[in-house]
Amino acid sequence: MHFRVERLELVNPWRIAHGVSTERTTVILERDGGYGEAAIVPYLGESSAEILAALSSFASNRLEHPRAGYRVDEVDGIASRGAQCALDLALHDAEARARGEPLWKILGINAVTHIETSFTIAMDTPDEMARRAREANASILKLKMGGVDDEACVEAVRGVTNATLRLDANGGWSREEAARLLPRLARFKIELVEQPLSVADGEGFAWLRAQQIGVPIFADESVSTLEGVDSLAQNVDGIVIKLRKLGGLRQAHAAIERARSLGLRTMMGCMIESSLAVTAAAHLALLCDLADLDAPLLIRNDPFSGLTYRGSAVLLPPGAGIGAVPREGD
């Protein structure tokens, strides 16, 4: 097992309710020809050092107690969610490559269907967000919210595009702000809003739902376990699924199935991470209603190649496994 930390440079400053970044880091793992990844996400509270330590401990334990192969469910015992994610992806990738099959097939998905992603515009001035919306020329845009001029920003973007608009507050609004803003923003034909309230406001989604805000609510940061899906099912319209926060493909797949059984819509999302993790997520996106898989478009120095983007359409790579390949020199 080999792992390393990669620095990802962002094309534009990534300004969201949690803070602003010009670069992010991610852990890349290789095991038996399979690749995995765990992005370092500030709000998740895990450092690269903690993830590497958990992976080292797991690898050392396997050397002391050797047996043939790994089982994917063994990663559940790892304390670090990031380490779980990286190892889960690598094991799935290695298994699919060994079988000579694409990842979607070993996940039990019957056919490749059309995937369409949104393109995210970080928080900025109304004029700058409108400029980026115009340049993006995308059919679906996601606008980061949580600033002082949210309404003006949405109005400016809507003034330059007929694209489908999604909003993402990353928990940056209070209950009162969300209840005041969302009915006003609904006039701009908003498809949905992600995580309008803080994770810390456990009862907030029920309260906000009762306000009849007129915009479908999707929970993101508030759902990092299957139990989280259950607890919010009555108070949201959909769930954002991310490999990194759930601990890999196995748990993400289970979360999709749980959400669907509860009548919730699902969106496959991503962190700021490389084409490796985002391509893996795209295989599971075949089971979801919506997708937000634009991270490779937001970074300058992607260490992997994988998905192909044609406008808002996302095309899976051919070949076995996840289908992501290290770029020359990595």
Model regions: which residues?
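A cross-domain feature marking catalytic cores of carbohydrate-active enzymes
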Residues: A38, G77, F119-I121, L143-M145, ...
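Predominant activation on well-ordered alpha-helical scaffold segments within soluble catalytic domains
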Residues: S56, Q84, D88-D93, E155-R158, ...
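Conserved, mostly hydrophobic/aromatic
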Residues: L29-R31, L87, G100, L141, ...
